[in-house]
């Protein structure tokens, strides 16, 4: 039976191959640290302002009240494990679930089944940043929920090119906010 109390656990999917990231982009210079993460195919470990991007994701989760984090990684992702095993964590506990092969999102979530137990969990990708305010809303919702952004909001407040906005997943909600 699944608990209906506010979740304190988050599953962060960090198993992707990063195959698109491994291709060189024109006019983009990477630091040695960024190159190492790119070569390993671990997008979440690309350095931003001297810290892995995943640090910002975990910090936002902690700010929103999530205390137990499970990173779903591949067996070859020592870069992630070495980093988080080597840093002091004051606001969160980090554990790992290994997805042996990259068989998709549902399989990655399944890899974290033991971590979830009977508790509610938040599931998010390691290479997407959600503001703590959005995560707080998910923390407080009594049932299932997702974060969605309006097309207008994406156009106005993101750095995503207009032509890519149409390529994103589209969710439709009814007047009460239920997925339609």
Would you name each region that the model predicts?
Residues 1-123:
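Conserved N-terminal catalytic core of the sugar/cofactor nucleotidyltransferase
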Residues 126-129:
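The conserved acidic donor/metal-binding loop of glycosyltransferases
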Residues 131-180:
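Conserved core of the sugar-phosphate nucleotidyltransferase
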């Amino acid at each position: 039976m699944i608990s209906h109390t506010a979740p304190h656990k988050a599953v962060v999917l960090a198993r992707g191959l990063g195959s698109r990231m491994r291709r060189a982009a024109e006019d983009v210079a990477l630091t040695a640290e960024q190159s190492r993460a790119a070569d390993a195919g671990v997008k979440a470990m690309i350095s931003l302002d001297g810290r892995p991007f995943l640090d910002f994701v975990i910090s936002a989760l902690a700010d929103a009240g999530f205390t137990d984090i499970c990173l779903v990684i591949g067996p070859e992702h020592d870069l992630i494990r070495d980093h988080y095993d080597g840093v002091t964590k004051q606001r969160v506990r980090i554990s790992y679930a290994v997805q042996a092969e990259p068989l998709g999102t549902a399989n990655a979530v399944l890899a974290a089944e033991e971590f979830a137990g009977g508790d509610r969990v938040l599931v998010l990708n390691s290479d997407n940043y959600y503001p703590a305010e959005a995560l707080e809303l998910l923390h407080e919702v009594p049932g299932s929920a997702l974060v969605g952004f309006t097309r207008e909001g994406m156009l106005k407040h993101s750095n995503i090119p207009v032509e890519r906005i149409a390529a994103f997943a589209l969710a439709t909600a009814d007047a009460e906010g239920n997925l339609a």
